[in-house]
A protein has these predicted regions:
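A transmembrane-helix-recognition feature enriched in membrane-embedded lipid enzymes
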Residues: 1-56, 107-111
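Soluble catalytic domains of membrane acyltransferases
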Residues: 54-185
Length: 185
């Protein structure tokens, strides 16, 4: 029953927040980013109230400050995509192109400047992917978030990292903030 209550309240809240922020698609990007932060806090609230989930952040003092960096995080659930927005200011997500096709949600992802890639496919479009990353890094101090294993995984899975995160680190020379997330248990 707790899982059902969580699902009802969580998804209803996400829909309400998404609808409330629809006009923000025509306003400055920072308003949509604020909506993402609210979704992160809503996610945390629902997890705590309905599922008694305690969110523990270890090593917060090690978060990179005052310079450009990217975040390489493990990806086990929807939780981290929302929650990371409460920790980092206006992150730019590197994500699979299919997410941009989701009505409303995809519009928000485009508005905040998310960088998309067609996974497992070499194409002309993907050749510009790295140029988009360079442009984003040069335009702002917003951190990039990449899930280097390329998809959500069960806590026990350990597939190899994709090449994107190492290429960003090696070729652009910006710092990497690794984050291990245990949201799948």
């Amino acid at each position: 029953i707790r899982n059902s209550l969580f699902s009802i309240f969580f998804f209803t809240g996400i829909v309400v927040i998404s609808i409330f922020f629809l006009p923000a698609l025509f306003l400055p990007k920072k308003i949509v980013l604020f909506g993402g932060k609210i979704m992160g806090y809503w996610t945390s609230f629902c997890l705590k109230i309905f599922l008694s989930t305690k969110i523990v952040i270890k090593g917060k003092e090690n978060i990179i400050k005052n310079k450009k960096f990217f975040i390489a995080a493990s990806h086990q659930s929807m939780f981290e995509t929302f929650f990371l927005q409460t920790i980092f200011e206006g992150p730019v997500f590197i994500l699979k192109k299919e997410l941009l096709m989701i009505p409303i949600f995809g519009w928000y992802l485009k508005k905040i400047g998310s960088i998309s890639i067609k996974r497992n496919k070499i194409s002309k479009e993907n050749l510009g992917f790295f140029d988009d990353i360079i442009k984003q890094i040069n335009l702002s101090d917003r951190p990039l978030i990449i899930f280097p294993q390329g998809t959500r995984l069960a806590p026990s899975e350990r597939p190899p990292f994709k090449k994107g995160s190492s290429r960003i680190y090696e070729e652009l020379g910006i710092s990497c903030q690794p984050i291990a997330i245990n949201s799948g248990n």
